[in-house]
Amino acid sequence: MVIMNRFSLVILVTAFLNAESFETFYQTGELKERFETKDGVREGLYQKWYLNGQIGKQSFYKNGVLDGELTVWYPNGVVKATYPISKGMIQGTAKYYDSKGNLSWQVYEENRPNKNNNIDFSSWCLN
């Protein structure tokens, strides 16, 4: 059991050895961004704040590529948009909200631009 615990600790330390956390700040000193890298490549949670301290954006990275839910907020703290991202591309339904949090419209996966960069608007859900 002791050998297994030491082995697990070595693996854990090795896994995080090349990981770094970064924070950037506005000139006024308020936190602007927080993110992590592994071996110099963005990995994990990314967050960006407005100057007023309100979260403005949150996303996730895997091997330097967006992967996971991306959320954007208005400066008043209300969700502005959500995007389901997989391997750097929107997969699923992107949702857009007005400044009061009411769903304004959605873009479904099948409404992505085609190879000619055209979009079929017939199946968009407008509220």
Could you tell me what each predicted segment is?
Residues 10-11:
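Gram-negative bacterial Sec-dependent N-terminal signal peptides
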Residues 2-7, 16-74, 78-86, 90-127:
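Periodic aromatic/glycine/histidine/acidic cluster detector
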